Amino acid sequence: MKVIIADDSKVVVERLVDLLRDIEGVQVVGQAGNAVEAIDAIRQMNPDAVILDLQMPGGSGLDVLRAIRPEHPGLYILVCTNYPYPQYREECLSAGASHFLDKSAEFEKIPAIFDDLIRDAAKAIPGASQG
C-alpha cells in the first residue's frame, strides 16, 4: 500500500513515518508540506492512501480533499489534525474523507487503521494472503 503524508510539521511527518515503517505492506512513497505539493504528489504518485493535515500553507487539507476526491474516488484519505472540532470533522467526512483523527488524542490509532486496511485489501484479492 503506497502512502503519501501531507503535513507541514516535520516532527509529525517523522512520527508518522516511524509509525508506518513497522507495518508490513505499507510504504511511504511521498511527502508534502503544503496543499499544492499534496495535490501534485497525489496526482503524480497515485497512492493508495493519504494522511492529510487540515491546516497547511497554501490551502487547507479540506481544499486538497475537495480537489482530489473526484479524481481518486478509491483513495483512502485519513485527515489527522490538531483542530478536531465537530464542524471540521463533519465537513471533511462530507467531502469524502475516509477517517478523521485528532492528532493529540488519537495519533496512536494510525497503525491499527493501516493494519485493517492491509488486511481488507488482502481479503479483496484472492490468494493474496497466501504469499
List the predicted regions and their residue ranges:
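The feature encodes the CheY-like receiver
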Residues: 57, 85
